[in-house]
Curated annotation (Swiss-Prot):
Residues 41-343 form the AB hydrolase-1 domain. The lineage of its organism: Bacteria, Pseudomonadati, Pseudomonadota, Gammaproteobacteria, Pasteurellales. Substrate binds at R212, D338. GO terms for cellular component: cytoplasm. It comes from Haemophilus influenzae (strain 86-028NP). Belongs to the AB hydrolase superfamily. MetX family. Transfers an acetyl group from acetyl-CoA to L-homoserine, forming acetyl-L-homoserine. This is Homoserine O-acetyltransferase. GO terms for biological process: homoserine metabolic process; methionine biosynthetic process.
Length: 358
């Protein structure tokens, strides 16, 4: 199945939360399973920072949730109709900094406006309206996708029955913002960045590659890296280069990332992570969270080095104090933050029960 596209906000522009407007927003999306006659089995999937609209492929390629989706699996395509779209600001089909600005005929680049999670959610809702879906059985997301799911429950509390938030907190921590700052600086200080207007020249590949290497360390655990590499060295490694195997692994991941992601999108989405505030547009966070009516599943991984257990505990407390019907689960995993993408045995029951409302 090839990704599908639709242009939204072509007659009325989207007003952004931090100011500015966007019109003629292309949205790349994909669907899986079959929408039943009652239209009560639809589930929205919200992807993480560098994800896209295709968590699953049926042609031998691996989607980012490939082993979780299919007939009888946690994301059961025999039972549910799944909708997944690339986020606003992304670079996998939905309008973002690398897209053509209809007013100039050139990529937006530095002219792309600042966006927040609330803007992303508005575009997702417009997509569902286009598809004729007025209610969802559930919304599920991990990491950055969990923030989107949380905001959905606040802004449109009657739109869904269940929320499944995996490895994501209500607020991003100071340490995590610090990691993102270093990653952004690696990109911004690349000589080829040119203020974000690099599309007619050489992209800031070195900076983006370095940023990705740092990001990968926050997604993994020390135990996982120790098991995989330890202090093993490369037979052909250079002293100041990839001398240790773990260094070679990170370099590979950094270079691989260049094949599929745009530096400006990375900057904008990292900042959207930092800026996420569920109370934006409301009196305070308690007022915002008190709007939630959905049954809410929140899953924490004790070895997560990005969204740490303390951050999830704080989120748990805020949600409970706001009267949310919260179901909280916590467990360890060698995979750390990325566990929600790969540790099927740990997540299968929580996802299955969360979607069904059990």
């Amino acid at each position: 199945m090839s990704v599908q596209n639709v242009v939204l906000f072509d007659t009325q522009p989207l007003t952004l939360m931090l100011g500015g407007k966007l019109s003629h927003i292309n949205v790349a999306y994909q669907t899986y399973g079959t929408l039943n006659a009652e239209k009560n089995n639809a589930v929205l999937i919200c992807h993480a920072l560098t994800g896209d609209a295709e968590p699953y492929f049926d042609d031998g390629r691996d989607g980012w949730w490939q082993n979780f989706m299919g007939a009888g699996l946690a994301l059961d395509t025999d039972r549910y109709f799944f909708i997944s779209s690339n986020v606003l600001g992304g670079c996998k089909g939905t309008t973002g900094p690398s897209s053509i600005n209809p007013q100039t005929g050139k990529p937006y680049g530095s002219q792309f406006p600042n966006i927040v999670v609330q803007d992303i959610v508005k575009v997702q809702k417009a997509l569902l309206e286009h598809l004729g879906i007025s209610h969802l059985k559930a919304i599920i997301g991990g990491s950055f996708g969990g923030m989107q799911a949380n905001q959905w429950a606040i802004d449109y509390p009657d739109f869904m029955d269940n929320i499944v938030n995996l490895c994501s907190s209500i607020y991003f921590s100071a340490e995590a913002i610090g990691f993102n700052h270093v990653m952004r600086q690696a990109v911004i200080n690349d000589p080829n960045f040119n203020g974000g207007d690099y599309y007619e020249g050489t992209p800031p590949d070195q900076g983006l590659s370095i940023a990705r290497m740092l990001g990968m360390l926050t997604y993994r655990t020390d135990l996982q890296l120790a098991k995989a590499f330890g202090r093993a060295t490369k037979s052909d490694g250079s002293f100041w280069g990839d001398y240790f195997q773990v260094e070679s692994y990170l370099s590979y991941q950094g270079k691989k990332f260049l094949e599929r992601f745009d530096a400006n999108s990375y900057l904008h989405l990292l900042r959207a992570l930092d800026m996420y505030d569920p109370s934006l547009g409301y009196e305070n966070v308690k007022e915002a969270l008190s709007r939630i009516k959905a049954r809410y599943t929140l899953v924490s991984v004790t070895t997560d080095q990005l969204f740490k257990p303390i951050d999830l505990y704080k989120s748990k407390q805020l949600l409970e104090q706001s009267g949310v019907d919260l179901h909280f689960y916590e467990f360890p995993s060698d995979y750390g933050h990325d566990a929600f993408l790969v540790d099927y045995d740990q997540f299968e029951k929580r996802i299955r029960d969360g979607l069904a409302g059990n």
